[in-house]
Amino acid sequence: MVLSPADKSNVKAAWGKVGGHAGDYGAEALERMFLSFPTTKTYFPHFDLSHGSAQVKGHGKKVADALTNAVAHVDDMPNALSALSDLHAHKLRVDPVNFKLLSHCLLVTLAAHHPADFTPAVHASLDKFLASVSTVLTSKYR
């Protein structure tokens, strides 16, 4: 999915407002995903999935760091996320549908924390951005 200049601007501005809360938001989105889509828990059998778990917080930070990297390299996400794509496709073998589920939970989390900033245009831009990230992460499944 091609991001327009306006989309890129919206994504960078929205992610900039996340600031130091990125890891917390990542963990919150994971918790939402585990509660809303229980089948996603199967990829984390070794995790304590309870609220506030250090493992969920740690993985939430990894998710947030990957998204921060994608925002910083929005014009070259395939190269920026190549190692992560390899990991999810070849080692972890995560079903691609799970990226869509996590993307949805991230959008809900961002909207809950920044309702005034979560305009329809920003929502659409973030949705396109997360779809692009998902496409990159699943590109090596083929």
Curated annotation (Swiss-Prot):
A single BP term in Gene Ontology: hydrogen peroxide catabolic process
Residues given in the record as heme b binding sites: 88
Residues bearing the modification N6-succinyllysine: 8, 12, 17, 41
Entry binding sites for O2: 59
Modified residues (Phosphoserine): 4, 36, 50, 103, 125, 132, 139
Modified residues (N6-acetyllysine): 17
Residues carrying Phosphothreonine: 109, 135, 138
Tissue expression profile of the protein: Red blood cells.
Span of domain Globin: 2-142
Domain of life: Eukaryota
Family indicated by similarity: Belongs to the globin family.
Function per UniProt: Involved in oxygen transport from the lung to the various peripheral tissues.
Record's protein name: Hemoglobin subunit alpha
Natural source organism: Ateles geoffroyi (Black-handed spider monkey)
Source species taxonomy: Eukaryota, Metazoa, Chordata, Craniata, Vertebrata
